[in-house]
Structure formats: C-alpha cells, structure tokens
Amino acid sequence: MQYPLPIARLIDNYMKLPGIGEKTATRLAFYTMDMPEDDVEDFSKSLIQVKENLHSCSICGNITESDPCEICRDANRDRSTIMVVEQPKDVMAFEEMGEYNGLYHVLHGVLSPMDGVGPEEINIKSLITRLQKQDEVKEVILALNSSPEGEATAMYLAKLIKPAGLKVTRLAAGLAVGSDIEYANSITLKRAVQGRTDL
C-alpha cells in the first residue's frame, strides 16, 4: 500500500536531512501529522525564517541575522587571532566552551577533490583577503576536524598563510582522529585550544 501523496512527500523531504533514513523519516512524518496544527505552523515558519533571515557574515562567513555578525562587531574580541573552522556549528561549539575570545573564519567545508570540492568552492579566498587587510592579526588557528580532508585543508591553508609572516597553529591532540569538533566536550576543546601547536 502506498502512502497518501502528502505523507509520501513529507517522508521524502525528511529523508533529505543528513542521517535520516526511510524508517526514521516515516516516523517523523507520522509524528508531524499527529502534532497540533499550531505546532506544525510554528515548525514550518521556523524553517522558512531560517532560509529568509539568516545569511553569511560578509567578514567571517558565520551565520547571522545582521551583517557583520555579532562576533565581528564586538570590540572586546581579541583581534590578533582568527580561528578557522569548517562550519558555523563549530563556532557555536567554541563559543559554548567560553575560553576563546578571538575572531573566527568559517570555510563552509573542506577540500575534497574526490567530491569536486577545491579551494574555489569553500571560503578560502575571503580568508586570504581578510588577512591581507587586517594588520592586527598575528595568529591563525586552524581548528578543522581531524578527518583526512580536514588535515589536507589545514596543510593547504598553512602553505598559503605562512609566507605572510603570521603564526599558524593547529589544535592540540585530544580530538580523536576523524571526530567532529561539534561533538567534542568543552574540556576537550579547551585543552585542544590551550595546547595548540605550530604548523
């Protein structure tokens, strides 16, 4: 038996989310169908607002409602360091840790030639332009996930940045190989930042 078209479409849409297979998508679709109408409307409005009201900061690439973002506008941030991360969720992880007070730069991905992702497909050009314009920057912290693609991206960036005379560091060991920063606890992140090493 086939599901009615509205349920089938909802299942298909849930399956577009990462880590959601057909069984989970089906459960979510039927749960959504049983939700009070007000909750469903609020949920759908939230989805639309995320797409309409959030965009990338023109300076760092983080998600924001205003441009530049709150972090880039904050005069109390340490402007001598820029931490380069893969995704906006990594910024959130470091901010929740509460130990880092510098600036960020979000790449929105990592180099992955097998997937057709080269330097032009991620936010590298704006990082280099930013480093050329902001004289107060002394250190670039490469806080990329410890996947093979993250490591390759870190090495690529280090080769681009070092000739400018800036200190380039990498997070210390402590993050398991292949692990994502967003899943690390705050103690692990704190130790990784404090024990960062030169590249």
UniProtKB/Swiss-Prot annotation:
Entry-linked InterPro entries: DNA_Rcmb_RecR, Rcmb_RecR, Rcmb_RecR_Znf, TOPRIM_dom, TOPRIM_RecR
ZnF (C4-type) intervals: 57-72
Swiss-Prot/TrEMBL GO biological process terms: DNA recombination; DNA repair
PROSITE patterns according to UniProt: RECR, TOPRIM
Domain Toprim: 80-176
Keywords, in A-Z order: DNA damage, DNA recombination, DNA repair, Metal-binding, Zinc, Zinc-finger
Pfam families with a match to the protein in the record: RecR_C (PF21175), RecR_HhH (PF21176), RecR_ZnF (PF02132), Toprim_4 (PF13662)
Keyword DNA repair: yes
GO molecular function: DNA binding; zinc ion binding
Protein family per UniProt: Belongs to the RecR family.
Function comment: May play a role in DNA repair. It seems to be involved in an RecBC-independent recombinational process of DNA repair. It may act with RecF and RecO.
Protein name, per record: Recombination protein RecR
Species whose genome carries this gene: Lactobacillus gasseri (strain ATCC 33323 / DSM 20243 / BCRC 14619 / CIP 102991 / JCM 1131 / KCTC 3163 / NCIMB 11718 / NCTC 13722 / AM63)
